[in-house]
A protein has these predicted regions:
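N-terminal cationic and glycine-rich segments that engage phosphates or anionic surfaces
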Residues: 1-430
Length: 430
């Protein structure tokens, strides 16, 4: 670790990239604390206005929605747009499917369409959020159409600015900008969450030391979960690959070439989508009058209830299989291997290679989906099994854990790759 940090600060260009990245993140967090003028933050904070689907948006934004800041939407419109465009490129819209196969040129075209869609989605999300919160909690100081339009425009501008800041990190800094913005938002709430948990668990009476022991045990269990998530995020299945030389003879090296496939190639998207699908009906009925129907909906779509929990788990498994096959195109991998003279030992090139990759992907996705279910279920099951933590509040639940560990591991990997590349180029020049 010390050697790694020494190498990081020894490289002048890398040091500048890290400082630039930290500067952009500081600007983003600064804006996250600025409430939109004309919004009554007191009436918003006094209500449970960040539950359901809004709670997911608030988590990803690091509390920006709870404060109704200029970055209230964060990068969520861009993420939603990216997912929609990616889904439509799966043989739904021919143009998008064609762009997907055109490499960097097609990627630029898709990115342009994604940003246009982001503009419309930010307007839609901003309008829905403002209307919902104003109808339910009266957040607008001046309840006029112009005040409504003004707040929506500020939210749109804030979302586009957040995306631009993320782009600057990706281009001039280190790591994926959008992911780091989400990472910073989630991590920024950790200190207050742990302090709140301490206040909830520890009572200053004769049993204080026992309460402190419970809190220490809680932290140890939490850190153990973090280690488990780090392990699962880095777990891969290696498929051996041989490449033929120009003479047709199989090249043999001391270290066999392999193709790595992550156990959890879908990332956190299945959990976010499953949570959003369950939260949407409850969020809608929360603005309605309480009836038998609304009570039934709240029970069915509440993942803390048996039926809702089963739905939650089933949706995570289904979305994991869907997104894994979306992320890893077996046909494309098979074609690339054939084009470059590569083959999997014992498997014929072409259709057999494609079927083999699909079979392996489905096998490891079973493990990946079950892992996601365990991580997502921990925050739900812990208060039931361990009653002392019933009132504990930790913002970094299963969804946040996967995001934070995934982004952290990917950023460290990029830094290590950068250092290795620079050292290799320096060696070549010598």
């Amino acid at each position: 670790m010390l050697t790694f940090l020494k190498n990081v600060f020894k490289k002048g260009e890398l040091r500048q990239k890290i400082i630039f990245t930290l500067g952009i993140l500081f600007v983003y967090r600064l804006g996250a604390g600025i409430t939109i003028p004309g919004v009554d933050i007191g009436s918003l904070s006094a209500n449970d206005a960040t539950s359901g689907i809004f709670g997911i948006m608030n988590l990803l934004g690091g509390g920006t929605l709870e404060r109704f800041s200029i970055f209230a939407l964060g990068v969520s419109p861009y993420i939603t747009s990216s997912i929609i465009i990616e889904l439509l490129s799966m043989d739904v819209i021919p143009a998008l499917t064609r762009w997907r196969k055109e490499g960097n040129t097609g990627k630029k075209k898709k990115d342009r369409v994604t940003r246009i869609l982001t503009l419309f989605l930010s307007a839609l999300q901003g309008g829905v959020l403002t209307y919902a919160f104003d109808s339910g909690y009266g957040i607008l100081v001046n309840n006029s159409i112009w005040a409504y339009i003004y707040v929506v425009l500020i939210m749109m501008a804030g979302s586009l600015l957040a995306i631009w800041l993320g782009d600057q990190i990706t281009i001039k800094g280190i790591g994926n900008g959008v992911s780091l913005l989400i990472f910073t938002g989630i991590v920024s709430n950790l200190p207050s969450s742990f302090l709140q948990t301490y206040d909830n668990l520890v009572t200053y009476d004769s049993g204080m030391w026992l309460d402190i022991a419970w809190y220490v045990l809680f932290v140890i269990v939490y850190l153990s979960i973090v280690v488990f998530v780090v392990f699962t995020e880095g777990a891969i299945r290696k498929i051996p690959v041989n490449y033929a030389s120009s003479t047709g003879v199989i090249m043999k090296t001391k270290e066999q070439t392999h193709m790595p496939i992550k156990i959890n190639s879908s990332g956190v998207l299945p959990v976010i989508f499953a949570s959003s699908v369950l939260a949407a009906p409850r969020t809608i009925v929360s603005f309605m009058e309480t009836t038998d129907v609304t009570n039934i909906i709240n029970t069915i779509f509440n993942y803390q209830e048996p039926v809702g929990f089963c739905l939650y788990i089933l949706m995570i498994i289904g979305f994991t299989f869907f997104y894994s096959n979306l992320q890893i195109d077996a046909q494309k991998i098979s074609d690339d291997l054939k084009k470059n003279g590569g083959s999997i030992p014992g498997i014929r090139t072409g259709i057999e290679t494609k079927n083999y990759i699909k079979r392996v992907l489905n096998q490891i996705t079973v493990a990946g989906s079950l892992t996601l279910c365990i991580i997502a279920a921990i925050p739900i099951m812990t208060p039931i099994i361990w009653t002392q933590t019933e009132n504990a509040s930790i913002s970094l639940g299963g969804t946040g854990l996967i995001i934070v560990t995934g982004v952290a591991l990917e950023t460290v990997k990029q830094i290590k790759t950068y250092i290795t590349r620079k050292e290799y180029h320096g060696y070549i020049r010598k």
